[in-house]
């Protein structure tokens, strides 16, 4: 039996790039834009808050991951439109 893979941030960035790739990406993901994923972002943020309020710390990492996925999604959209990328987001928060 082999150990489960340990994923890193670059794996998530790669996954999003694959989902949004014009050739062979996910049809649903390819249709999305900044505005269309806002409801999903809000839902994920509420799920993080709910897990914290319920002190469900076993489930919190999964909910935080879902919220991080939203940030990665926006970053991919920004990169595609040559507005910004994930590194810009990280630099922005770190420089604050």
Enumerate the language-model features and the residues they cover.
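Extended low-complexity intrinsically disordered regions
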Residues: 1-60
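An amphipathic alpha-helical micro-motif enriched in hydrophobic residues
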Residues: 41-49, 57-79, 87-94
């Amino acid at each position: 039996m082999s150990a489960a893979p340990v994923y890193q941030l670059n794996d998530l960035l790669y996954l999003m790039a694959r989902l949004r790739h014009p050739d062979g990406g996910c049809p649903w993901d390819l249709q999305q834009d900044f505005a269309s994923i806002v409801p999903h972002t809000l839902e994920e943020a509420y799920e993080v808050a709910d897990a914290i309020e319920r002190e469900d710390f076993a489930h919190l990492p999964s909910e935080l991951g879902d919220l991080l996925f939203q940030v990665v999604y926006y970053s991919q959209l920004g990169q595609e439109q040559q507005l910004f990328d994930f590194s810009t987001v990280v630099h922005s928060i770190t420089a604050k």
